[in-house]
Curated annotation (Swiss-Prot):
Cofactors, names only: [2Fe-2S] cluster
PANTHER family named in the record: OXIDOREDUCTASE WITH IRON-SULFUR SUBUNIT (PTHR44379:SF5)
Protein's UniProt name: 6-hydroxypseudooxynicotine dehydrogenase complex subunit beta
Keyword Metal-binding: yes
Molecular function (Gene Ontology), one example: 6-hydroxypseudooxynicotine dehydrogenase activity
Species: Paenarthrobacter nicotinovorans
Length: 160
């Protein structure tokens, strides 16, 4: 099979490498770039654990071919922490005990990040539930995840 020359920016770093045309974006990120924060749960795009941002939009990396990301910008959960400081969403997830095993957490965080970055978006408990409705957690139920989401947006909106 012929390799495809992939050029992609991942977490601010440009990578140019050959990939098999059938290689999934999740596998490229985890195995080729060693970014293991992106988790693969269902391998069908249903659970949301593999969510990353592709040109600022959440996508299920287990259903996207790496070649589809050519000349694009990708953000993974590893991009959230800056200079040793957790992103406000990560702080709220920790503060509100919104994780147990942590397998799904990166997917929730990357689903919420574009909403958090849009200062025109505010979330209450109802809209937070809707925002995360495409992500599945098998451990916590969802109350703590909703509380963490509302807390992060409240802190952002009130400069806490």
């Amino acid at each position: 099979m012929n390799a495809f020359r992939l050029t992609v920016e991942v977490n601010g770093v440009t990578h140019a490498t050959d990939v098999e045309p059938r290689r999934l974006l999740a596998d490229f990120l985890r195995d080729d770039l060693h970014l293991r924060g992106t988790r693969v749960g269902c391998e069908h795009g249903v659970c949301g654990s593999c969510t990353v941002l592709l040109d600022g939009q959440p996508v299920r990396s287990c259903t996207v071919l790496a070649v589809q990301a050519n000349n694009s910008r990708i953000e993974t959960v590893e991009s959230l922490q800056k200079d040793g400081q957790l992103h406000p969403l990560q702080r709220s997830f920790s503060k509100c005990h919104a994780l147990q095993c942590g397998f799904c957490t990166s997917g929730f965080l990357m689903t919420l990040k574009p909403l958090y970055d849009d200062e025109d978006v505010t979330l209450d408990a109802t809209s937070a539930r809707e925002a995360i409705s495409g992500n599945i957690c098998r451990c916590t139920g969802y109350q703590q995840i909703v509380e963490a989401t509302v807390d992060a947006f409240h802190c952002r909106d009130h400069n806490d």
